From Swiss-Prot:
It is a multi-pass membrane protein. It is found in: Cell membrane. Keywords: Cell membrane, Ion transport, Manganese, Membrane, Transmembrane, Transmembrane helix, Transport. This is Putative manganese efflux pump MntP. The gene is mntP. One of its GO terms (molecular function) is manganese ion transmembrane transporter activity. Probably functions as a manganese efflux pump. InterPro entries: Mntp/YtaF (IPR003810), Put_MntP (IPR022929).
Amino acid sequence: MSFFTLMALAVALGTDALSLSVGIGLTGISRRRILQISATVLLFHIFMPLTGWLVGEFTGSLIGRAAAVIGSLLLVGLGVKMIWAAWRNGGETEPSLVRFNFWGLLLLGASVSMDALSAGFTLGTRQVNLLLAAGVIGLVAGAMTAGGLVFGRFLGSRVGERAQLLGGLILVGIGIKLFF
């Protein structure tokens, strides 16, 4: 696999994380939280292709579907909560809505890296340095996540009171997309 092909794969696998992170960043987020979320996504995007390669397609598809359903429900729930808070409070942001604890970070990382699990099955059948591929995929996804969070934070400061509503709508949309 050429480096260009690997980079294209990495960018494609990072797009869910990018779009989700813009939605999260819209409500305002600290630098520390940006690092935590980006590192979580990075690690999951390294771990999942390796898991896909090691575990095999059948077991991975069962685990992957359950994690995708849980992750998508989490995103829809968070998005609905943000929309409700924006509606109820006239658009005032509540950063506590996007504070992720340990389990929340794990679910977030799993929900946006299911495609990387599937990619691991394919990479395992090719003549490719799997550790290098997983590392590149993880680094690109982590960088895309950080960029999305920073952009979302910037955009949220410009959009003002509608940022929470917009962020909630984005999260609901991504959650629904990940479900199907």
